[in-house]
Design a protein with these regions (language model features):
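Glycine-rich active-site loops that engage anionic ligands at enzyme catalytic sites
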Residues: 23-113
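N-terminal intrinsically disordered, low-complexity, charge/repeat-rich segments that act as generic
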Residues: 1-29, 45
């Protein structure tokens, strides 16, 4: 059963053969970006690690910056418009590029490491 609502959409992030992690996209954080991502589902791609703090994968989503941030907490989900990438934060991080916060991983975050 999904706990989704108009302002929050619960998704499953699946790392093939490794883990399934619940992810909440929150429309109130960045309405335009979350709406664009929701219309683009399902998404598939190859995951890449950036240092020890960020797991990301590139997509074909085209959305500008919205409510930009450079500081993120463990479990945050953000969109990097310059690369069209979805980013999952494995640790608290200050990043050099601005991103749009779009949601939160709700469980089993360490399975991404």
């Amino acid at each position: 059963m999904s706990a989704s609502s108009v302002s929050r959409k619960q998704l499953i992030l699946e790392i093939r053969g490794k883990a399934k992690i619940s992810c909440d996209l929150k429309r109130h954080l960045s309405p335009r970006t979350v709406g664009t991502i929701m219309r683009s589902l399902p998404l598939e791609g190859h995951a890449h690690l950036l240092g020890k703090s960020i797991l990301y994968f590139e997509s074909n989503i085209n959305s500008g910056i919205e409510r930009s941030k450079t500081e993120f907490k463990k479990g945050d989900v953000a969109f990097l418009p310059s690369a069209g990438s979805l980013c999952f934060f494995l640790n608290d991080t200050v990043f050099t590029k601005t991103m749009t916060l779009i949601g939160k991983l709700s469980e089993n975050i360490d399975a991404l490491k």
